[in-house]
Regions:
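Active-site metal-coordination/substrate-binding segment of hydrolases
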Residues: 64-146, 151-162, 184, 313-316, ...
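Acidic, glycine-rich active-site loops and adjacent beta-strand->loop/helix elements
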Residues: 76-78, 139-147, 169-172, 211, ...
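His/Asp/Glu-rich mid-to-C-terminal helical/loop segments that flank catalytic regions of hydrolases
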Residues: 222-240, 270-272, 317-324, 332-335, ...
Length: 485
């Protein structure tokens, strides 16, 4: 990265270093080895726990020994996505970076700035001999992206710091002081396959072209849920015609708003044209309802060959009604922070699985644990009434905003002093590891900030280079102004 002459040089040096080290989620052994070697090379106390979290300690610089101990924290795994025309093995190949104007990108893959830039920043501070700071502990956690494994496994006593600064935020100039907790509620309907009539009109109906997005960050933007839209139409058909449901499929990831859903159905041949008319009317209704948020919404209906088997009508009816009943979207807004979603649920996916089962995954989020549990129980109740087997996962805790946080005041004052403007203080309706840290270390004072990233979790991931220097200057000034013990 040196040949690119990016500033701050030390941060980009280490970012390029770790871009050479493969680090997919759940396969972080190479980056763990790199961090342990780094600790030895710099003669710093280094330890790991049973899941691979790494903690590197650095003593205070002279005159700063009386400051409270600060934990700097980043996760070491990255989301591994590539364009279909790119040859790349994330287990062995380095990430190739390229400068595009003011942005740093990768060549057809995720960049890994989420959260590699946080890791690089910590390494630059650990390696520096000209930066003032109090006692430091640098925590590097594993598998944030696919299970929060490192944060879940963290044991009390592994760290000793008083203040934790999470470096996993993506908007420079914004300070985060809260996040949602979450859990998945999964329902399974077991059906009896029945013989499908051969003299019916078979058709595949699909909802496509939706915007989708993150089920936390984007849940308040009025976007449509493909599973909900498809189910609504199927329920209409079932109330008017003899409807056989043969297949149903929608959505994929628990943390994504589903963009597409489809079903294979059959109605008596005499109702063939009526179904087409119904879909045209329904599509016009949706285009009116979602004119502002879903400009590319479309429906499709295509004739299909007859199926041999269908879902029994009783189960199909219970399924459609239960999916219709479950809440989807924002449920409550925060009473503390204007504009922040407090509680929501996402009808994430509907899949047919082995054993004649239909599996439905929903995801609940809230910054208040009792509200999240209430939302999960609401979803559970609707599915139980429909005859499904329902389970709610253990979940992860939220981080309730503390507007009186001492480290927040330091960070706000520092930003105003350095840049002449007030930073935005926010919470997010998505998960951060901070909620789990607070569960294990209840007295921690926490804040999260970082440089500007866009397109994370996709090959379009990019980092705004000038914001890295601002982030760096801000972090170093915060470290100098940490309160005394």
């Amino acid at each position: 990265m040196n040949e690119k002459n990016l500033k701050p040089a030390s941060v980009f040096y280490y970012f390029e270093e770790i871009c050479q080290v493969p680090r997919p989620s759940k396969r972080e052994e190479k980056i763990i080895a790199y961090l342990k070697a780094f600790g030895r090379e710099h003669d710093l106390e280094t330890k790991t726990d049973e899941v691979g979290n790494v903690l590197i300690k650095k003593p205070a610089t002279p005159g700063k020994e009386n400051l409270k101990t600060v934990i700097l924290q980043s996760h070491i795994d990255m989301v591994c996505e590539k364009n279909s025309d790119v040859e790349h093995d994330f287990l062995i190949d380095p990430i190739e970076t390229v400068v595009d104007g003011e942005w740093l990108k990768a060549k057809g893959t995720t960049l890994g700035a989420d959260n590699g830039i946080g890791v690089a920043t910590e390494l630059a501070i650990l390696a520096a001999t000209d930066i003032e700071h109090g006692p430091l502990e640098c925590l590097f956690t594993v598998d944030e992206e696919t299970g929060l494994t490192g944060a879940f496994a963290l044991k009390p006593g592994f760290m000793t710091g008083d203040i934790l600064i999470n470096l996993d935020s993506e908007d420079e100039g914004e300070l985060f002081i809260g996040c949602a907790g979450g859990a998945n509620t999964t329902a399974e309907f077991t059906y009896q396959p029945v013989s499908a009539p051969q003299d019916y009109f078979y058709f595949r109906v699909a909802v496509k072209g939706l915007t989708g997005g993150h089920s936390g960050d984007d849940i308040n933007k009025g976007r449509a849920n493909a599973n909900k839209l498809l189910n609504r139409f199927l329920t209409q058909l079932a109330s008017k015609y003899i409807l056989y449901l043969c297949e149903i499929d929608g959505g994929n990831l628990h943390n994504a708003i589903p963009r597409e859903a489809q079903a294979l159905c059959a109605v008596p041949m005499k109702d063939k044209e009526s179904v087409r008319v119904d879909l045209n009317i329904y599509t016009a209704e949706l285009e009116n309802e979602y004119a502002a948020t879903e400009p590319n919404l479309r429906t499709e209906l295509s004739s299909e060959s007859p199926c041999k088997e269908a879902i029994d009508m009783t189960t199909a009816g219970h399924l459609l009604r239960a999916v219709y009943a479950v809440h989807n979207g924002v449920y409550a807004m925060s009473q503390d922070i204007p504009g922040l979603v407090e509680t929501s649920s996402n009808l994430a996916s509907i899949k047919q699985v082995e054993g004649n089962k239909i599996k439905i995954v929903t995801s609940q989020r809230s910054s208040i644990l009792s509200s999240r549990k209430d939302m999960s129980e609401m979803i559970r109740s609707a599915f139980l009434l429909g005859g499904a087997e329902v389970t709610t996962g253990e979940g992860y805790p939220g981080w309730k905003p503390n507007t009186d946080s001492p480290v927040l005041k330091v960070a706000v004052d520092s930003y105003k002093k350095l840049f002449g403007v007030e930073p935005k203080v926010k919470a997010i309706h998505a998960g951060l590891e901070c909620g789990l840290f607070l569960e294990k270390y209840p007295s921690l004072d926490m804040v999260s900030f970082g440089p500007t990233l866009r397109g994370v979790h996709s090959p379009d991931e990019r980092m705004l280079i000038p914001t890295v220097d601002k982030f760096w200057r801000h972090l170093l000034d915060v470290l100098v102004n940490i309160p005394t013990k």
